[in-house]
Amino acid sequence: MARTTIRSEDITAGQVKSADLASDAVDTAELANDAVTVAKMNDSAYLANRNYIINGNFDIWQRGTSFTGANDWTADRWLIHANGTSPSTTQQTFTPGQTDVPNFPKYYLRYNAGTSPVDVGEVNQNVEDVGVLGGKEITFSIWAKAASGTPDLGLLIYQNFGSGGSANNIVMSDNSLWTLSTSWQKFTHTVTIDSITGKTVGASSYTHFRIKMAHDAINKDISQVQVEVSPTATPFEHKTYGQELAACQRYYEKGAMHWRTSPSITWGGNYYAYNTASFKVTKRAAPTIVLSNEYTTDGYSDYNTADITTDEFALNVDSDSSGVSAGWWISTDWTAEAEL
């Protein structure tokens, strides 16, 4: 009897194209059970922008590369809470060509709680908008190791419902979810974030992720942190430096202003020079502006920010009572922070 079933070996590459298939020719009834599964999809193609953690690869360090404070913003979007004596957080560089952590990351974060810490150290990030992950099954993944011993690594997740919103809701908290070794390992944890149904959500809400470090003076290294809506962990999502920087600049940006007063007009008495700075990326909210390294070549005495929006701010520079000469330079560095 002639065979009527067509097997894959009967079809050459490119022989059947989408244009050859009638509408609805292939639907779920024609697919065998488990022909398409999450695991199989994870083994093939990955969705873009699936990682809700910003700067999980620790590529962006706008504020510097070494920190010793107890409550410091360190690598972009990462806030450290430490309670020991002389804690430290530093940027470390992978050996070129290493294969312990896949996809050739360049940097990782090293944390040390310092001496005599009284509680776990914390490496924190807030994912903007509590509704984004509410009610979803997510998988948290991280690569980590310790300089010595087998210290614990934990995870806390809670929902913050913003200004005037419902009270914080702890999704999970475990100080010893994983055990580190002196070799890089990938750790994962899957959990369903609580639904926000019935909650009041105010401004600046977020889902908080806290990596909890054992309270000892051992160096602990972390890399490639990812949070995705998935029942399993997929390989870390790589983004270009420019993509990651732009995402970080929604919350923090640094820049400078330099300008010159009129080259032909001398001003007497009190006078102010006015200029504006535009942000490269629209901020999450109107940011806090901090000025530094203010400089002028004439009698300006007071720098004041004004008209701060999510896209720009203005700077008024007041002169002293003696006035200013023509054509003098004014400059300042600035930072704009709109972190959660």
Predicted feature locations:
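Extracellular and organelle-lumenal recognition/adhesion modules and their flexible linkers in secreted
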Residues: 34-340
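Short, low-complexity N-terminal tether/leader segments at secretion or assembly junctions of large
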Residues: 1-43, 223-236
